[in-house]
């Protein structure tokens, strides 16, 4: 095993031994942020039990990809993603898949490392059926339009100040104490004109 890999494994093991009860915490992102900051975004089913590699302290889940929304270029010549990798311990942000339904589809947004898909507790991994119509539309086509120019800017405390005209102020967490508010479920931060972004509703228009 390479020296760096051995060192990384030792550090992970040490963290687990000295702080077994310390939970991994993170602030859930707006779905558009999750899309834009991820290398690969797919819809997939978890079809296998976790397999733990005790040398690297990582585990992998076998998945069946049903749709890819982002990552075609990053994958290169690879035609499919068969496994998703995560730290083996939740104390170091390892993802633990709870659902036993192997036919249930999940939206998975993660990072590619050496051609392998990695996720953590902080990754955006949610049942596809739990997403709103607007969120599904966003992951399918719309969020990508805002990645290069626009930024969802989370408001942590009042007063909130935007740092740029290309930022959209996200207040769901502050006002509702939840990342599942109206802005998360129905809005996308999209370019309106050069140098300007604004919230745009993705809900279907009523006749």
Curated annotation (Swiss-Prot):
PANTHER family, per the entry: METALLOPROTEASE INHIBITOR (PTHR11844), METALLOPROTEINASE INHIBITOR 1 (PTHR11844:SF20)
Oligomer and partners: Interacts with MMP1, MMP3, MMP10 and MMP13, but has only very low affinity for MMP14. Interacts with CD63; identified in a complex with CD63 and ITGB1.
Keyword field: Disulfide bond, Glycoprotein, Growth factor, Metal-binding, Metalloenzyme inhibitor, Metalloprotease inhibitor, Phosphoprotein, Protease inhibitor, Secreted, Signal, Zinc
Site (Involved in metalloproteinase-binding) residue list: 37
Region Involved in metalloproteinase-binding: start-end pairs: 24-27, 90-91
Region forming the signal peptide: 1-23
Protein name: Metalloproteinase inhibitor 1
Residues where Zn(2+) binds: 24
């Amino acid at each position: 095993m390479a020296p760096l890999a051995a060192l990384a494994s030792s550090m992970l093991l040490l963290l687990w031994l000295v702080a077994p009860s310390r939970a991994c915490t993170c602030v859930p992102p707006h779905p558009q942020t999750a899309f834009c900051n991820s290398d690969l975004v797919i819809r997939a089913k978890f079809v296998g039990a976790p397999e733990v590699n005790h040398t690297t302290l990582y585990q992998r889940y076998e998945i069946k990809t049903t749709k890819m929304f982002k990552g075609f270029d990053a994958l290169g010549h690879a035609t499919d993603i068969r496994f998703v990798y995560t730290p083996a311990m939740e104390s170091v942000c390892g993802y633990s898949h709870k659902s036993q339904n192997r036919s249930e589809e999940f939206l998975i947004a993660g990072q590619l490392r050496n051609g392998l898909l990695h996720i953590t507790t902080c990754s955006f991994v949610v049942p596809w059926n739990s997403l709103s119509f607007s969120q599904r539309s966003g992951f399918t086509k719309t969020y990508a339009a805002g990645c290069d120019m626009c930024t969802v800017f989370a408001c942590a405390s009042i007063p909130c100040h935007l740092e740029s005209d290309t930022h959209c102020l996200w207040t769901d967490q502050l006002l509702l104490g939840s990342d599942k508010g109206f802005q998360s479920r129905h809005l996308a931060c999209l370019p309106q004109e050069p140098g300007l972004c604004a919230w745009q509703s993705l809900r279907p228009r009523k006749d």
